[in-house]
Every structure is written in structure tokens, then in C-alpha cells.
């Protein structure tokens, strides 16, 4: 009879376990979009873009003009949670300032 030492690994026979590599998908991305209205001052929109989306003044002005001319403009593209947070922050700030500015998120 063979004696097995305590630290000797035991050998498995018959079954091979394969490891499958997990393929992680990148998270879904969402556009944060400002919608045009006839009441929110252009300067307020520029300030929102600078404060909440870290846009420089020139870029913020270009986005604001896109919102004004085309009815909506993309502020940035983010993961769902970040986009939802930005929409809520902008909407709350606009409401508190007495402006009807609307901010929404759309799938990118």
C-alpha cells in the first residue's frame, strides 16, 4: 500500500476544467443634451456648460449657438450614471435660477 505525504498534491484524472475568459462589454454611453427655449438667457447656458461640463468659453459658446439654432445641442457623452447626475444637476440649477432650460439624456 502506497503512503501519501501530507504536502504532496493529489492528481485528478478524467476531468479537464477549462477556464473561459470573460468578455466585458463597455458600458452604454449617453449624450447629455440641452434643449432650446425662448426664455433662458444665452449667457446662462454658457455658464452651465462651463460649470457642469468643463467647457472653455469658446466651446461653450459654440454649443450654446447650436442649441439656439438647431433646437438642441450635445454637452457631452457619459456613462448612464454620470449622464443622469449631470441632467439632474443642470435641471435643478436652472429651476432654482428661474429658467425653463431643459436638459435630457439620449442613448449615444
Curated annotation (Swiss-Prot):
Q: Share an example GO biological-process annotation for this protein.
A: proteolysis
- Extract the SUPFAM superfamilies matched here: ClpS-like
Where are the annotated coiled coils located?
none
Q: Which InterPro entries match?
A: ClpS, ClpS_core, Ribosomal_bL12_C/ClpS-like
Q: Which Pfam families match?
A: ClpS
Q: Which domain of life is it from?
A: Bacteria
What the protein does comes down to: Involved in the modulation of the specificity of the ClpAP-mediated ATP-dependent protein degradation.
Under NCBIfam families, the record lists: PRK00033.1-5
Subunit details:
Binds to the N-terminal domain of the chaperone ClpA.
Sequence similarity: Belongs to the ClpS family.
Name under which the protein is recorded:
ATP-dependent Clp protease adapter protein ClpS
Give the gene symbol: clpS
Amino acid at each position: 500500500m502506497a503512503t501519501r505525504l501530507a504536502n504532496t498534491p493529489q492528481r485528478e484524472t478524467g476531468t479537464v476544467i477549462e477556464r473561459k475568459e470573460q468578455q466585458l462589454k463597455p458600458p452604454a454611453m449617453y449624450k447629455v443634451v440641452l434643449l432650446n427655449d425662448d426664455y433662458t438667457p444665452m449667457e446662462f447656458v454658457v455658464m452651465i456648460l462651463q460649470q457642469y461640463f468643463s467647457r472653455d468659453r469658446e466651446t461653450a459658446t459654440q454649443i450654446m449657438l447650436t442649441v439656439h439654432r438647431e433646437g438642441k445641442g450635445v454637452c457631452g457623452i457619459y456613462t448612464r450614471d454620470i449622464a443622469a447626475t449631470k441632467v439632474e444637476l443642470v435641471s435643478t440649477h436652472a429651476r432654482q435660477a428661474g429658467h425653463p432650460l431643459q436638459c435630457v439624456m439620449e442613448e449615444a
